[in-house]
């Protein structure tokens, strides 16, 4: 997976905007993970509507407040913004664990062509080996939420034997005193999600008009 960004710099979306530039560091952050390539733009209303949905999706899978162990998931924002200021503004409220390409890196455009992205927003899901698992998961994320990951993981395991479980790589996660609270909150959130699924989308859904997307090319 790291080979996709070989020789490039990725930047962490934290306050210091730390650069991830060595091959070893890239491998540590991307290898043996499902990687989401999020194509979006701050000036795109559909992207603005979808961003909170994707943020919530990512946080619920990677934040230890919600899960005992972060999912094997990485996200790279591939900006289609016309200016660097718009890119920075769009990323300001997004998770610190997100990665993004420098604004002046032409790979931003090349990746759009490589993965045949025609409209925004778009989320390309890549297997650990770099092959495309889902060409655009935008609607799936909106419809299923974090449950998408289990489906992708199962498909990746069937199609790519290099996808290892976390216990094959790391020491068992230590349990904290907040574990019962996390478990209870997860159960409540899960039950609420199921209830909404039975009753239909509620009027407070943050998706907005994300069903209609902007043409890119």
UniProtKB/Swiss-Prot annotation:
Start and end residues of each stretch annotated as Disordered: 188-217
CDD domains given in the database record: TryX_like_RdCVF
Sorted UniProt keywords: Cell projection
GO biological process: photoreceptor cell maintenance
Tissue: Expressed in the retina (at protein level). Expressed predominantly by photoreceptors in both the inner and outer nuclear layer (at protein level). Not expressed in the testis, spleen, intestine, lung, cerebellum, or kidney.
Membrane-crossing segments per the record: none
Disulfide topology: none
Basic and acidic residues composition-biased segments: 188-204
Domain called Thioredoxin: residue spans: 1-164
Localization annotation: Cell projection, Cilium, Photoreceptor outer segment
GO molecular function: receptor ligand activity
Chief subcellular location: other
InterPro entries attached to this UniProt entry: RdCVF (IPR029520), Thioredoxin-like_fold (IPR012336), Thioredoxin-like_sf (IPR036249)
GO cellular component, one term: mitochondrion
Keyword Methyltransferase applies: no
Summary of subunit composition and partner proteins: Interacts with isoform 1 of BSG.
Job of this protein: Plays an important role in retinal cone photoreceptor survival. In association with glucose transporter SLC16A1/GLUT1 and BSG, promotes retinal cone survival by enhancing aerobic glycolysis and accelerating the entry of glucose into photoreceptors. May play a role in cone cell viability, slowing down cone degeneration, does not seem to play a role in degenerating rods.
PANTHER family: NUCLEOREDOXIN-LIKE PROTEIN 1 (PTHR47109:SF1)
Family indicated by similarity: Belongs to the nucleoredoxin family.
Name of the featured protein: Nucleoredoxin-like protein 1
């Amino acid at each position: 997976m790291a080979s996709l960004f070989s020789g490039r710099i990725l930047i962490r979306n934290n306050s210091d905007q730390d650069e991830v530039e060595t091959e070893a560091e890239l491998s540590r952050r991307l290898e043996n993970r499902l990687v989401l390539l999020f194509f979006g733009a701050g000036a795109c209303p559909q992207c603005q509507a979808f961003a909170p949905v994707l943020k919530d999706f990512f946080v619920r899978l990677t934040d230890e407040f919600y899960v005992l162990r972060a999912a094997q998931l990485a996200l790279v924002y591939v900006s289609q913004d016309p200016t660097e200021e718009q890119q920075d503004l769009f990323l300001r409220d997004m998770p610190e664990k997100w990665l993004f390409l420098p604004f002046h890196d032409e790979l931003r455009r090349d990746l759009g062509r490589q993965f045949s992205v025609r409209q925004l927003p778009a989320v390309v899901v890549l297997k650990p080996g770099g092959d495309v698992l889902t060409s655009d998961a935008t609607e799936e994320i909106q419809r299923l939420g974090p449950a998408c990951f289990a489906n992708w993981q199962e498909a990746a395991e069937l199609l790519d034997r290099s996808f290892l479980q976390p216990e094959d790589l790391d020491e068992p996660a230590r349990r904290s005193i907040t574990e019962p609270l996390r478990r209870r909150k997860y159960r409540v959130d899960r039950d609420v999600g199921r209830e909404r699924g039975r009753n239909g989308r509620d009027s407070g859904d943050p998706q907005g008009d994300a069903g209609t997307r902007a043409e890119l090319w």
